């Protein structure tokens, strides 16, 4: 079991370490404050990357071949536009026997017991609407 003297020594060591770390942190913060802001350095690096990529693209022989091919293409389009627009789907009235429905826009089902909307309550039912 640790006695009070050992505990006091360990606490004093931890306190001295903490003070030295505090001084180190202040020194690091001062060093960072004296340098250029991060945003400016990132913009500089990004500009260099863009310039390098632009130079690589301009110097690439395949790029020159593409530009020559585009320069030699005919001025008129090789594939003409369609003269008539394609007809859309012909969606006529629903002609399949639609028993169980009775909406006029779907056509008549011929079923006398077909449901209609708005719903009409049968005789004897309380009026809900």
UniProtKB/Swiss-Prot annotation:
A GO CC term assigned to this protein in UniProt: host cell plasmodesma
One annotated GO molecular function: DNA binding
Chief location bin: virion
Record InterPro entries: Caulimo_virion-assoc (IPR004986)
Xref: Pfam families: Cauli_DNA-bind
Recorded coiled-coil stretches: 1-31, 38-59
Region listing for Capsid binding, in residue ranges: 122-129
Keywords for the protein's UniProt record, in alphabetical order: Coiled coil, Disulfide bond, Host cell junction, Virion
Keyword Coiled coil: yes
Domain of life from the UniProt record: Viruses
Compartmental location: Virion; Host cell junction, Host plasmodesma
Entry similarity comment: Belongs to the caulimovirus ORF III family.
Self-association and partners: Homotetramer, through coiled-coil domain. Homotrimer when interacts with icosehadral capsid. Interacts with capsid protein, and with Movement protein.
Role this protein plays: Plays a role in virus cell-to-cell and plant-to-plant transmission. Interacts with virion icosahedral capsid and movement protein, thereby facilitating virion cell-to-cell transmission through plasmodesmata opened by viral movement protein. Also interacts with aphid transmission factor, attaching the virion to aphid stylet when the animal feeds on an virus infected plant. Aphid saliva may later detach the virion, inducing release of infectious particles when the animal feeds on a new plant.
Official protein name in the record: Virion-associated protein
Source organism (scientific name): Cauliflower mosaic virus (strain D/H)
């Amino acid at each position: 079991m640790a006695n009070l003297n050992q505990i006091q020594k360990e606490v004093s060591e931890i306190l001295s370490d903490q003070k030295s770390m505090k001084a180190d942190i202040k020194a690091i913060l001062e060093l960072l404050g004296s340098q250029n802001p991060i945003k400016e350095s990132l913009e500089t690096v990004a500009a260099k990357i863009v310039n390098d990529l632009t130079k690589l693209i301009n110097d690439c022989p395949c790029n020159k071949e593409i530009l020559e091919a585009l320069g030699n293409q005919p001025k008129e389009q090789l594939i003409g536009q369609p003269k008539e627009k394609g007809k859309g789907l012909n969606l006529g009235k629903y002609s399949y026997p639609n028993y169980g429905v009775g909406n006029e826009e779907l056509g008549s089902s011929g079923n006398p017991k077909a449901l209609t909307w708005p719903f009409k309550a049968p005789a004897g039912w309380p009026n809900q609407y």
